[in-house]
Amino acid sequence: ITVVGQCIGAKDYEAVKKYTKKLMLITYGVVWAMTLLMLLFSKQILSFYSLSEETTTMTMEVFIVHGICAVIVWPLAFALPNALRAANDVRFTMIVSLLSMWIFRIGFSYVLAIYFNMGILGTWIAMCIDWFCRGACFVIRFARGKWKNISFIDN
């Protein structure tokens, strides 16, 4: 992300887009690889623990939900905002992250896990909803280019 900050300092916004896209592709590649390894070796990973059959089944469900969400939206929710922060768009990323966490991750966790009786799977689904909402906000912000006009020096 340092290179993105340098391009912003040089006001080379096409390079910012180019390097952000490149870094996002790398992030997607790493997330895909890590998720694939996690899913391929999930039984071996779980064998380190003395889990009941019910807990093992539940954990596998969580692995699958996490894996699907991670490969689709995790980079948008957690890597893309780094490019926005490099452009000094820190207030927006902080507000979106806090609101999304409190409304979607915590609020929906309660609703899905307790009210709809989904248990831990509901909590993980709520986390994926949080990632999706963050990612959508950050993609829209980056695409609109408002980050180009944020000053680095307060007057």
Residue ranges and their predicted role:
Residues 53-77, 99:
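Alpha-helical transmembrane segments of multi-pass membrane proteins
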Residues 6, 47-48, 61, 86, ...:
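Transmembrane helix-loop junction
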Residues 24-36, 67-72, 102-107, 128-137:
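Hydrophobic transmembrane alpha-helical segments of multi-pass transport and channel proteins
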